Amino acid sequence: MPTSVKCPTCQKDVIWNNESKFKPFCCERCKLIDLGDWASEKHAIPVKPEFDADDLDNLGYDEADFFKEN
């Protein structure tokens, strides 16, 4: 029995096999809608910021000093 998944955009059933041209999407339209959502930042992968602005302030980093010449 072939594996079936839901299209992430329209929730239509999609057969998952080598002939599925747009998998996991059902069609090119749904694929492009999803791409547009990523491009407009409706979708995002959550990440923890490498540096917290408050931590940098506590360490003594000041934006005003950044552009001063020595």
UniProtKB/Swiss-Prot annotation:
Manner of cofactor binding, per the entry note: Binds 1 zinc ion.
Residues binding Zn(2+), per UniProt: 7, 10, 26, 30
Gene Ontology terms, MF aspect: DNA topoisomerase type II (double strand cut, ATP-hydrolyzing) inhibitor activity; zinc ion binding
SUPFAM superfamilies for this protein: Glucocorticoid receptor-like (DNA-binding domain)
Superkingdom classification of source: Bacteria
GO biological process, alphabetically ordered: regulation of DNA-templated transcription
Pfam families: YacG
Needed cofactors: Zn(2+)
Keywords in alphabetical order: Metal-binding, Zinc
Function: Inhibits all the catalytic activities of DNA gyrase by preventing its interaction with DNA. Acts by binding directly to the C-terminal domain of GyrB, which probably disrupts DNA binding by the gyrase.
HAMAP family registered for this protein in UniProt: DNA_gyrase_inhibitor_YacG
Summary of subunit composition and partner proteins: Interacts with GyrB.
NCBIfam families xrefs: PRK00418.1
PANTHER family membership: DNA GYRASE INHIBITOR YACG
Family of this protein: Belongs to the DNA gyrase inhibitor YacG family.
Protein's name according to its UniProt entry: DNA gyrase inhibitor YacG
Organism of derivation: Shewanella woodyi (strain ATCC 51908 / MS32)
